[in-house]
Amino acid sequence: MSESNELIEQRIQKIEELKKQGINPYPVRFFPDSKSKDIAEKFEKNPTGPETKFKLGGRLHSKRVMGKASFAHLKDNSGIIQLYATKDDLGETQYSIFKSLDLGDIIGLEGYLFKTQKGEITLHVTSVELLAKCIRPLPVVKEKDGVVYDAFADVEQRYRMRYVDLIVNDHVRDTFITRSKIVSEIRSFLTQEGFLEVETPMMQPIAGGAAARPFVTHHNTLDMQLFLRIAPELYLKRLIVGGMDRVFELNRNFRNEGISTKHNPEFTMMEAYMAFGDMSTMLDLTERLITHLAQKICGTLKIQYGKDLIDLSPPWKRTTYVDIIKEYSGIDFSQIISLEEAKKKASELKVDVSKCQTIWKVADEVFSEKAEPNLIQPIFITDYPKELSPLAKSNPDKPGYVERFEPYVAGREIGNAFTELNDPFDQKERFEDQVKQREAGDDEAFMMDEDYIRALEYGMPPTGGLGIGIDRLVMLLTNSHSIRDTILFPLMRPE
């Protein structure tokens, strides 16, 4: 039997021993009235005596048994506090239970605070109760100096067993607490800007709103094929048609694509649409939102991301899609007239464009390989080609291009926005072109959506639209370098 299995068996045996004593190892309830950090801070300012009792609940973090007295540490979601327990105070039965506790056990305590000779605020335990046994041993390095867990450093294992990761790595928990604050702050910001939060279908008969492969499912009762949404865009714009002038949705999207440090098949997006807005109003909104978040969450507009100090102070730099590709690859795609020439130039840069069917698809691969990794400081890339933007309004001053921008920070895209196409005739033509690309083998090309065309035929006002990837934004504001570090339960291969 392995050492781990032996420890598990020993802990299970302790549960059985408690049952024999008539003690329920999984009691129905325990209600703490305090948090360790709060009572320690208050005690430091205003010491209390034995008459003031506190009830705490948490995990046993460390333990040192010294005969009739023991020291330990309890960890709750506010911090760690030292415990002092004696046989005289607890009595034979409870002190025996205290001594038999294992690291990771969830316990309930009652006691009063005092300071040790070394000046450490400590809970003098007067009552102890096992609330849930930690049957599987937590990763342990040592049981002294307040350091009892290893780093749980195997990344794959951390993602698979996030519950253990959260127990042993405080910085992981801090990341997800920050994520929650970011999401809450986004909602508050947009609400103050006059946007109404809405919910649109997660299952859609047509996968639209983005160039991506969808997940496919089937509704048995209706006997119809459905897709998990790749984007909420077309439904949100239907709401603009219906007179809801400012709407946003912050929710999940699903794309049946690869997994990387920047991509997870299930991810969170915020999309916002503003009637009587355009690309410029959404650019302003994006800049204000992200700088607001940085100031609120990080306390500064200059944030450290890896080795780079990123300055989010407005105004952000702006440059065109064609110019940024030319800057980092030397290729001016506005001057290329054949697919063969485009592929040849890309291949000279060792960019794989074998699956690309158009010049601008080649350009996009070159952009991703050569330009994007260099966009460390915040920048808005503008004036995208019409072919790559089937839902964006054409730029009247630049034929072949649209009113679209994407913000980039730390070498990755964090959003996408444009002046929305509201001409139903133009939109139908673009859908038809996308269908041709799809029939030619591009499984990321858009599907035809006749109902969306019908909605546009009722009239949609000039509109600005914006989408921001929440997971990537959290990466930026928490100095995380994999999207999996910002998603509690990322998709994993089977063990």
Curated annotation (Swiss-Prot):
One GO BP annotation of this record: lysyl-tRNA aminoacylation
Keywords: Aminoacyl-tRNA synthetase, ATP-binding, Cytoplasm, Ligase, Magnesium, Metal-binding, Nucleotide-binding, Protein biosynthesis
Keyword Oxidoreductase attributed: no
Database matches in InterPro entries: Aa-tRNA-synt_II, aa-tRNA-synth_II, aa-tRNA-synth_II/BPL/LPL, Lys-tRNA-ligase_II, Lys-tRNA-ligase_II_bac/euk, Lys-tRNA-ligase_II_N, Lys-tRNA-synth_II_C, NA-bd_OB-fold
Chain positions recorded as Mg(2+) 1 binding sites: 406, 413
Catalytic activity, EC: 6.1.1.6
Pfam families noted in UniProt: tRNA-synt_2, tRNA_anti-codon
Family, similarity comment: Belongs to the class-II aminoacyl-tRNA synthetase family.
Subunit: Homodimer.
Protein name, as recorded: Lysine--tRNA ligase
Organism (species): Leptospira interrogans serogroup Icterohaemorrhagiae serovar Lai (strain 56601)
